Amino acid sequence: IMRDPRFDNIPLILETVNPDIWAEEIAWLKSQAEI
C-alpha cells in the first residue's frame, strides 16, 4: 500500500499499540520508503 501511487497525497496512519517498538517500526517504514 505504501508504494501504490493511488495512495499518493493521502495521509496514512501508523497504528502501533506498543510504544516500546515505535522507533523500530518507524525505522522499518523509512527503510521501505527507500526501496
UniProtKB/Swiss-Prot annotation:
<dbReference type="GO" id="GO:0008833">
    <property type="term" value="F:deoxyribonuclease IV (phage-T4-induced) activity"/>
</dbReference>
<feature type="binding site">
    <location>
        <position position="15"/>
    </location>
    <ligand>
        <name>Zn(2+)</name>
    </ligand>
</feature>
<keyword id="KW-0862">Zinc</keyword>
<keyword id="KW-0227">DNA damage</keyword>
<keyword id="KW-0540">Nuclease</keyword>
<keyword id="KW-0378">Hydrolase</keyword>
<dbReference type="GO" id="GO:0046872">
    <property type="term" value="F:metal ion binding"/>
</dbReference>
<keyword id="KW-0479">Metal-binding</keyword>
<keyword id="KW-0234">DNA repair</keyword>
<protein>
    <recommendedName>
        <fullName>Probable endonuclease 4</fullName>
        <ecNumber>3.1.21.2</ecNumber>
    </recommendedName>
</protein>
<keyword id="KW-0255">Endonuclease</keyword>
<comment type="similarity">
    <text>Belongs to the AP endonuclease 2 family.</text>
</comment>
<comment type="function">
    <text>Endonuclease IV plays a role in DNA repair. It cleaves phosphodiester bonds at apurinic or apyrimidinic (AP) sites, generating a 3'-hydroxyl group and a 5'-terminal sugar phosphate.</text>
</comment>
<dbReference type="InterPro" id="IPR036237">
    <property type="entry name" value="Xyl_isomerase-like_sf"/>
</dbReference>
<dbReference type="GO" id="GO:0006281">
    <property type="term" value="P:DNA repair"/>
</dbReference>
